[in-house]
Swiss-Prot record:
The keyword Membrane does not apply. CDD domains: AlaRS_core (cd00673). This is Alanine--tRNA ligase. Consists of three domains; the N-terminal catalytic domain, the editing domain and the C-terminal C-Ala domain. The editing domain removes incorrectly charged amino acids, while the C-Ala domain, along with tRNA(Ala), serves as a bridge to cooperatively bring together the editing and aminoacylation centers thus stimulating deacylation of misacylated tRNAs. It comes from Xanthobacter autotrophicus (strain ATCC BAA-1158 / Py2). PANTHER family: ALANINE--TRNA LIGASE, CYTOPLASMIC (PTHR11777:SF9), ALANYL-TRNA SYNTHETASE (PTHR11777). The gene is alaS. Keywords: Aminoacyl-tRNA synthetase, ATP-binding, Cytoplasm, Ligase, Metal-binding, Nucleotide-binding, Protein biosynthesis, RNA-binding, tRNA-binding, Zinc.
Amino acid sequence: MSGVNEIRSSFIDYFVKEGHEAVASSPLVPQNDPTLMFTNAGMVQFKNVFTGVEKRPYSRAATSQKCVRAGGKHNDLDNVGYTARHHTFFEMLGNFSFGDYFKDRAIELAWNLVTRTFELPRDRLVVTVFSEDEEAYGLWKKIAGLSDDKIIRIPTSDNFWSMGDTGPCGPCSEIFFDHGPNVPGGPPGSPDQDGDRFIEIWNLVFMQFEQLPGGERLALPRPSIDTGMGLERVSAVLQGVHDNYDTDLMRALIAEVAELTSVNPDGPQKASHRVIADHLRASVFLTADGVLPSNEGRGYVLRRIMRRAMRHAQLLGAKDPLMHRLVPVLVREMGRAYPEIVRAESLAEETLLLEETRFRRTLERGLSILEEESTGLTSGGQFPGEVAFKLYDTYGFPLDLTQDALRARGISVDTTAFDAAMARQKAEARASWAGSGEAATDTLWFSVRDEVGATEFLGYETEKAEGVVAALVRDGAVVDSLAAGEKGLVILNQTPFYAESGGQVGDIGRVSGEGGVAAQVVATQKKLGDLFVHEVKVETGTLKRGTALVLEVDHARRAAVRANHSATHLLHEALRRVLGDHVAQKGSLVAPDRLRFDFSHPKPLSGGELAEVETIANRFVLRNEPVETRIMAVDDAITSGARALFGEKYGDEVRVVSMGTDDGNGAPYSVELCGGTHVKRTGDIGLISVLSESAVASGVRRIEALTADAARRHLNAASAALAGTAAVLKAPVAEVEARVATLVEERRRLERELAEARKKLAMGGGGEASGDAVRTVGDIKLLARRVEGIEIKDLKGLVDEGKKQIGSGVVAIVGVTSDGKAGIVVGVTADLIARFDAVALVRVGSEALGGKGGGGRPDMAQAGGPDGAKAEAALDAIAAAMAG
């Protein structure tokens, strides 16, 4: 029985033969126990069975339970890699009795397994019992035939187990393997018990009491059994090695690390090989169970594990991402026992690759800062907690990674100051957000943010990922679920969906997952700076908190947005080259169907300038050069020439997007600080077509443009229209512009002639004013006429013409428009201004037309009214006013 897989199978097979149900491992994320970060023992999935809350169709069970201890009080992370038996991920073999057999049968089954099935020498086995458990002491003597010196009484809580302050509890009995006197260490309970000579391989818990508040214990009517055997530990014993990392499974992983790094796994860097092997298992199994790296909760613990391994890969000299290349070996070794990692193999590889790629970009700078800040520290010194927090907050360095990097130098970290900095940041964030325009939902989003943490954005690297529903909101309140047909807001632990910001619209797409749930993502917004909120409409199933989902961004739409966003960068720089360095971005809209770019410039662009801007931008599109993104300190980025845009708030670390190569000096053509999504190469933009240029405000201009397919369709339509025009004109395309210009000028000439003809016709054909249009009011001539087909702006010209015709008098002309409204102009010849005021007369006419007011000079005034049908009445009213 040499292999770990055979040992696991033998354990399960043994208990199945003894009437136990083989129960599959439960997930690493406890399904019904919010008090636990991760499943850390075999009994976790049976907790409700032991307490009587849940019934199972069997009373005996055997499992091989996957476990993680890397957070909370069960945190082995710091020791992993440096000791023989510490792990973040491990397997716990166990057999359980739910009110069926008890101590005697449990001891008999355990003894027979280790001595008969596993064939461990009896004389190398030692057991412990709780000092008050005389029954267990007697049973070991009776069943196993152990002498008194092989049964050790332990008076401490090490041999008394409890589920909590209240609930089931009972004494324990542990089985130890003695490696012999050549190995340092003493027996359990002795001052030297922490040595490697005596290794615990199995713990039997006899649940026989119920702990009541106040300290009283009652005997359980149906006592139960819970046992746990560490597979890694017992495998080391059975394989004759003293170190869990020397078992066949771990050596297979370590050997692959050594192969890929060309570093001796048993040399000075042995610990790094072990860290990677252990953390690989935790990373893959957690990913398979729906945990993905993030900055809060379980995802943060996973990120710490991954990044600690990645840091050790870097110490081994790995130049490229390493962790994802180890996944196939792990799947080969453990996939038969745990088929979930077979199903999740590609997801695990993708997640590890993305995480390591992201981490490597910031690792070098973070380590440089760590080195600078710790230069004056020597062994025994303490690294400032505030600096450790900056490394965490700005560069994604978990605290334990900083501790691990300083460990070799004997330097500790001031964790109290680290915690204080963390608390201070949260308080400042709340204060700075006050009055930001989201007051109505501040409390809600801060509450959600505190509970679920920041959303991890994956969209720079992928458009499809897996995520877990962290919170749901409907009608301004947190809810437990969203049913089919309902709309609401979904917050995920991580997302590939870009949230609207920096002028770029948010992504849309679909999510789907377990239980047949599917929903449309119709918008993605950002709250509090780092909380991504997905507006969804559930189509089928029910979205619940904790639901694992496949997240798919609308690829075509995202591609169009990327093209438009990258085009704004090219256009921005082209505008600076054509118009001058005063050009600065003042706003933008990056949508899938178009782009809009606002910039500072004092006057309209000429046609030549606009064409030159478009030509320059398209020159870099045609070159199809790479678009590069770097993560830099904001000060370094700006010093290097990157353009920081208006109104943007930047952290200590920024994304710098560069594209194109300048013809003059070989430097990047465009370099900007930008958090948006971009094409991989400028050629992916396809084409840039500028549609228009206009004014937005004083000193601010706007250009609108299309890219890619939208630009192509626009140009195709324009080309078709041009060809159609040429056909109508019966002229070659090259002559269309000149022919159209000629036609336009001819039209204008004809329109002028027509207007003159209408004026003459309106005034009686060009001679003296016709008698029927001239009235005599007292001794004053009044030329009053209603006209149609004359633009209102031309009425003054008609009045001037009328004044010439009558020599002395008043002229009143009402022009009726095609929509039934009217304009009225009144003129008074110079000799009569002392008697008649044109303004007063036009107001009388306007009132008759249903209007109010009017204005002008005593000799010429204008007004209007909504009712052109009252034109004659208006003229009569003016005549009456003159007579009055």
